[in-house]
Structures are given as C-alpha cells and as structure tokens.
Design a protein with these regions (language model features):
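Basic nucleic-acid-binding interfaces
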Residues: 1-149
Length: 149
C-alpha cells in the first residue's frame, strides 16, 4: 500500500490516588478541557472526556505511534502538574495504573454517551463495580488483590 490508514480509538480510565474525591464539580470542566488540550498537543483527538470526583474516562483517537501506555502517561503526567499548579491541590495525584480499552468506530457514539452520563451512572454503581465490568467484558484476566493498590 502507498499510504497508512488507521482508526485507533481508546477508552482510557484512571482514578485519583486512593480514589480520593479531588475532581470536584467546581473544577471538573476546566480539568476535562485541559486534558483535551493535552491530547491535541500530542496528536490525539479527545472525542469525549469526563468522569466524577474520583476518576476520569477519556475517549481518544490516537496515531499509531502512541501506545496506550504512552497515552495514559501523557494525560496523567501533564494534567497532574497542571492541577497542582492551577488549583494548589498539594495532595493530588492520579493512581499508578490505568485501563485502556479499544473501541470500534461503530461504538464511538455509545462510549461518548456513556462518558457524558457518568454522574448519573455512578448514582447506581461504584467505580470499582464499573471497572470490574470493563475488565470482565474485555476478557482481561486480573487478580483483585492488585487492582486497587
């Protein structure tokens, strides 16, 4: 082939350290916007970013040179520095790990809706329940002793 064509959508999920409620409603819109800017700066497209006080969901389209681990590292690292600087949240940090799940183009609208409705969704389900469902639906083997750090 003369050219390379990709369609790489990732649903990335990570929480605040110890799932502390740092991303309060008064700062969340700014945090989500800033993370969208980080994505753009690194040749990604943030299709939807959202979450609740203790975790984030980001649906991004990424170039093939970025591995999921790099995507998580970039989003977490740059946003953490900015959150410390912008809001003086000295104890804030993201958890060490993350989840990254591929999304087919045909499922992008459903994932966007899912992320937009996080607040409603978490009236019925905890982050831990939600995350376990993602792992199970994706067929990812895990040991629960090492999930929550």
């Amino acid at each position: 082939m003369a050219n390379t064509y990709t369609s790489l959508h990732y649903h990335v999920i990570f929480s605040t350290k110890n799932r502390e409620p740092w991303i309060t409603p008064d700062i969340e819109a700014r945090v989500w916007r800033f993370i969208g800017g980080i994505a753009r700066k690194h040749a990604m497209t943030a299709l939807q970013i959202g979450g609740v006080e203790d975790h984030l969901h980001a649906l991004v389209t990424a170039p093939p040179i970025l591995a999921p681990s790099q995507i998580a590292q970039i989003l977490k690292g740059e946003s953490s520095k900015w959150i410390h600087r912008e809001f003086q949240l000295k104890g804030f940090s993201w958890q060490d790990g993350y989840g990254a799940f591929t999304v087919s183009t045909s499922n992008v609208p459903q994932v966007i809706s899912y992320i937009q409705n996080q607040r409603e969704h978490h009236r019925r389900k905890t982050f831990q329940e939600e995350y376990l469902e993602f792992l199970q639906a994706s067929g990812i083997k895990y040991d629960e002793r090492y999930l929550w750090g």
